[in-house]
Amino acid sequence: MKRTFQPSNRKRKNKHGFRERMATANGRRVLAARRAKGRKKLTVSDEYNGVKA
């Protein structure tokens, strides 16, 4: 049986990246919540832009 998690960086960025979060009101709420909590890494995009948690 095939496993459910088949990793792909492209799909990961497209679904959970910064631009995708900014595209919807709820996505912006997610970012605001993560900023308020003091998260070092807001989205998966940050991993590729030098933040690396």
From Swiss-Prot:
<protein>
    <recommendedName>
        <fullName>Large ribosomal subunit protein bL34</fullName>
    </recommendedName>
</protein>
<dbReference type="GO" id="GO:0005840">
    <property type="term" value="C:ribosome"/>
</dbReference>
<dbReference type="InterPro" id="IPR020939">
    <property type="entry name" value="Ribosomal_bL34_CS"/>
</dbReference>
<feature type="region of interest" description="Disordered">
    <location>
        <begin position="32"/>
        <end position="53"/>
    </location>
</feature>
<dbReference type="GO" id="GO:0003735">
    <property type="term" value="F:structural constituent of ribosome"/>
</dbReference>
<feature type="compositionally biased region" description="Basic residues">
    <location>
        <begin position="32"/>
        <end position="42"/>
    </location>
</feature>
<feature type="region of interest" description="Disordered">
    <location>
        <begin position="1"/>
        <end position="20"/>
    </location>
</feature>
<keyword id="KW-0689">Ribosomal protein</keyword>
<dbReference type="InterPro" id="IPR000271">
    <property type="entry name" value="Ribosomal_bL34"/>
</dbReference>
<dbReference type="GO" id="GO:0006412">
    <property type="term" value="P:translation"/>
</dbReference>
<keyword id="KW-0687">Ribonucleoprotein</keyword>
<comment type="similarity">
    <text>Belongs to the bacterial ribosomal protein bL34 family.</text>
</comment>
<dbReference type="GO" id="GO:1990904">
    <property type="term" value="C:ribonucleoprotein complex"/>
</dbReference>
<feature type="compositionally biased region" description="Basic residues">
    <location>
        <begin position="1"/>
        <end position="16"/>
    </location>
</feature>
<dbReference type="Pfam" id="PF00468">
    <property type="entry name" value="Ribosomal_L34"/>
</dbReference>
